[in-house]
Amino acid sequence: MNAVSDLRALHAAQPGWQAALSLGFERRGARTVLATRRHVGPLVVQRALYPEGDGVCHAIVVHPPAGIVGGDALRIDVDLGAGAHALLTTPGAGKWYRSAGARGSLVQRIAVGDGAVCEWLPQESIVYDGAAGDLATEVDIAGDGVFIGSEMTCFGRSGAGERYTRGDFAMRTRIRRDGRTLWLERGRVEGGGALLDSPVGLAGWPVTATLLVAAKTVDAALLEACREVPAEAGEGAATLLPGLLVARYRGPACEPGRNWFNRLWTLLRPPLAGRAATLPRIWHT
């Protein structure tokens, strides 16, 4: 069963929003098309966009409730066929609201076919004080596929002076190529816990973010180019693993981290995806 049929079976029986979105992209001639689109509940893509021409399909994943609360269970499945190129983002910050006890969850599964390029670039997630949630991302790449993905999380509404003092938020990310694990990370941030202030954690900053670039052609020259790009506030660093470039940010707000990632993306996209970087218009609204 796929994500949509699974959620249909559970939709009536579970509390909270039970939502699923399944997207399939295919290369047809010189054009990438959104060939399949199924959803249950309030999780949708309204239409395919082509601001860069036919070769790259942009899709904006919309969750009309605008946030996740305890008891919500969301799942997104994205499948890129061989040679397809898709960029997926969100219309604004995702929110994980305070929980009365139940946990919310978001599972993201992405399959990248041989020669395909998936750019998974959601806007930041804000974890409210008292939120309890689980975020899991699974990426499976075939052959020479390329994955460029980012995840940015702000613990507490820092703009309102709120800190994350209660609740807990668990994150898990795995990337595999042809069944071989390139990256596996698990973490849990507890409200008021030591990790928020530890120098090996957030070091007192509210925002943490990771940019993961999986490509067979990523090399030391690209790493050095990324290291030449400073973060305007907070701390940014990059490293190279076999077949994977990893950039980390922690800092006082989402905007400087987002700006740093955008500059890295501008460097990395032409050699890895064959196109100059063009920021999605939705990021400016």
UniProtKB/Swiss-Prot annotation:
GO terms for cellular component: cytoplasm. GO terms for molecular function: nickel cation binding. PANTHER family: UREASE ACCESSORY PROTEIN D. It is found in: Cytoplasm. Belongs to the UreD family. Keywords: Chaperone, Cytoplasm, Nickel insertion. The keyword Cytoplasm applies. This is Urease accessory protein UreD. The lineage of its organism: Bacteria, Pseudomonadati, Pseudomonadota, Betaproteobacteria, Rhodocyclales. It comes from the Bacteria. UreD, UreF and UreG form a complex that acts as a GTP-hydrolysis-dependent molecular chaperone, activating the urease apoprotein by helping to assemble the nickel containing metallocenter of UreC. The UreE protein probably delivers the nickel. Required for maturation of urease via the functional incorporation of the urease nickel metallocenter.
